């Protein structure tokens, strides 16, 4: 099933003049979920409801990277929009989205680089509008450039994540550093907006999507004790704790329970 990030990747591929080689590009991947083919998650794609929307502004080659986590966001959050960033040629559809009266855009960026009056730490429903989180999907150096050179974003509040929230999230992840991927930032934003079920499912999706990378070159064993079996069961039980109603309604997860 196509979504905004996959369509943006297709558009970027059409403009490419040579193969894009990056970390993870040698492994054969499912064209839809972008997970290594042996562990395709298409049948397990979450379908949770969320009031929030996501707007991914992606630096030039980000959609081409096999390890880009914008795919996970689009898999979980239905209202995910993705645009390639350009300093000069701004996408008209992006501007129309930012002007859509149903949305209250927030640009997610560290507050120390922004005028104090623009910084907010909470997500408020202004006039009943739904929150739209603008995420700069790029390296840190590229993201700073995007922030400085995008004047059309200057009218929006800058959402800065609180140290307490970052600390709570760090306890749930294996790496102990201050660098978060795009999907992890999105999960924190969803939590702030009250979309806790979507936030939790995205956390699980992100954590487990990284598990299959070191296993990719090993022979695949089938059966209940295979890595695939542990992978899917772990995914199910994690989602069940976060969002039991959705998990029990999903046929794939019910089947996993019966096999467990």
Label the predicted regions.
Residues 7-23:
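Short Cys/His-rich Zn2+-coordinating modules
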Residues 27, 37:
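Residues immediately within or flanking Cys/His clusters that coordinate Zn2+
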Residues 30-33:
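Short cysteine-rich clusters marking metal-coordination/redox-active sites
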Residues 41-56:
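Short cysteine/histidine-rich zinc-coordinating motifs and their immediately flanking basic loops
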Residues 78-148:
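S-adenosyl-L-methionine/SAH cofactor-binding core of RNA-modifying enzymes
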Residues 132, 140-239, 246:
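C-terminal folded domains that constitute the principal catalytic or ligand-binding module
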Residues 243, 249-252:
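Cysteine-centered motifs
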Residues 254-259:
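Short, intrinsically disordered C-terminal tails of secreted or membrane-associated proteins
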């Amino acid at each position: 099933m196509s979504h905004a990030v996959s369509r943006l990747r297709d558009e970027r591929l059409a403009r490419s003049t040579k193969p894009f080689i990056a970390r993870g590009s040698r492994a054969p991947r499912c064209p839809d979920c972008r997970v290594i083919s042996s562990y395709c998650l298409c049948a397990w794609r979450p379908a949770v409801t969320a009031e929030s929307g996501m707007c991914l502004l992606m630096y030039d080659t980000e959609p081409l990277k096999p390890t880009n986590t914008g795919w996970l966001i689009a898999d979980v959050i239905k209202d995910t929009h993705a645009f390639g960033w350009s300093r000069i040629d701004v996408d008209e559809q992006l501007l129309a989205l930012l002007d859509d009266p149903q949305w209250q855009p927030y640009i997610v960026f560290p507050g120390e680089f922004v005028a104090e009056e623009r910084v907010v730490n909470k997500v408020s429903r202004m006039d009943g509008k739904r929150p739209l989180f603008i995420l700069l999907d790029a390296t840190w150096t590229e993201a700073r450039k995007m922030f400085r050179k995008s004047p059309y974003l200057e009218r929006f509040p800058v959402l800065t994540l609180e140290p307490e929230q970052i600390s709570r999230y760090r306890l749930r992840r294996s790496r102990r550093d201050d660098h978060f991927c795009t999907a992890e930032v999105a999960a924190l934003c969803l939590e702030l907006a009250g979309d806790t079920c979507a936030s939790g499912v995205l956390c699980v999706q992100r954590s487990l999507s990284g598990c299959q990378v070191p296993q990719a070159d090993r022979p695949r064993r089938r059966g209940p004790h295979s890595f695939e079996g542990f992978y899917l069961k772990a995914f199910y039980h994690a989602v069940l704790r976060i969002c039991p109603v959705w998990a029990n309604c999903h046929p794939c997860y019910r089947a996993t329970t019966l096999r467990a």
